[in-house]
Amino acid sequence: MSVYRIKYTPRARQDLRKLPRDVAQKAIRAIDEISDAPYLYIKKMKASNPKHPVYSFRVMRDVRALLSIHNDVLIIHVLEVEHRKHSYRDF
C-alpha cells in the first residue's frame, strides 16, 4: 500500500500519450513504486523554487519524470514525463 497518492497534471498525461506504450507503462509502474518512500529515488532540481521544489526521477535510462511533492497532504504531483533532453527546459 502506498503512502503518497499520485496525481498527474494534464501536461504529464499528454506526455505519457506521446511516449511509446511500453515506455509509458514502465513510467507509470516506476512512479507507482516510489510512492512509499519517494525521497529515496529522486533528486531536487537546483534551479527550483525553495518553497515549492521540483524533483527529477529517473524512470528509465533516457526518460525523466518531474515531480512536486506535497507532504502535508501526501500527494506526488507528476508534472512532466519526457525524454531527458526535453524534460529540463521549463524548470
Descriptions of predicted regions:
Residues 21-24, 39:
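Alpha-helix boundary/capping and short turn/kink residues
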Residues 8, 23-26:
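Generic hydrophobic secondary-structure packing signal
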Residues 26, 43-44, 85:
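A general lysine-centric signal
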Residues 32-57:
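A short, surface-exposed loop/turn module that caps and links secondary-structure elements
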Residues 5, 22, 31, 45-46:
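Hydrophobic alpha-helical segments with strong N-terminal bias
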Residues 2-5, 10, 14, 18, ...:
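Enriched for short, Lys/Arg-rich terminal
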